[in-house]
């Protein structure tokens, strides 16, 4: 979070699904603010829980916990918390929207994780494909060809993928919360 660069040395900064890994949003956004020249822009794709997320629903909470565990995330904020963090360090928030919620003839963002259709890529994401992968890794671990722990990593990633699919279907999570912000001109 501490970039070795002079203050006000960037004309623009963007982040695509990267700042979601920062446990302290104001700190990371503050560092971006420090680096930007006055009037410069910041574009962000952020993970966040949507307005449909119900913190009182045990099913929603389990999905969120699986997303955090599988994604290695300490927190997944809601959009209001993210917007507040940007404003708290001085940004003007020019535009925000959940690009995953846009209507139109598109494939849902989580569809590649479902494993539907007939292709090598979809087989890999299918229930059978994940079973084959885990059992192949088990055999490779037993033969000491793959390092110990590969199955555990695979299972954690599969847990996250399943949680992303369920969260996407329910509309309680988006990996595509778009923010366009600006450092005020002096």
Question: Which residues fall in each region the model found?
Answer:
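A short glycine-rich, Lys/Arg-flanked "PGG" loop and its adjoining helix->strand segment in the class I
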Residues: 26-41
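Active-site loop signature of alpha/beta-hydrolase-fold enzymes
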Residues: 2-3, 21, 50
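Short hydrophobic/aromatic beta-strand element in the GNAT-like acyltransferase core
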Residues: 178
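A short SAM/SAH-binding and catalytic strip from SAM-dependent methyltransferases
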Residues: 11-26
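A short acidic, Gly/Pro-enriched loop at the edge of an enzyme's catalytic core
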Residues: 1-13
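Short loop/turn motifs at secondary-structure junctions
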Residues: 9, 38, 90-92
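Acidic carboxylate diad motif detector
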Residues: 44-46
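Substrate-binding/catalytic lobe of Class I Rossmann-like enzymes that use SAM or dcSAM, i.e.
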Residues: 55-173, 182-184
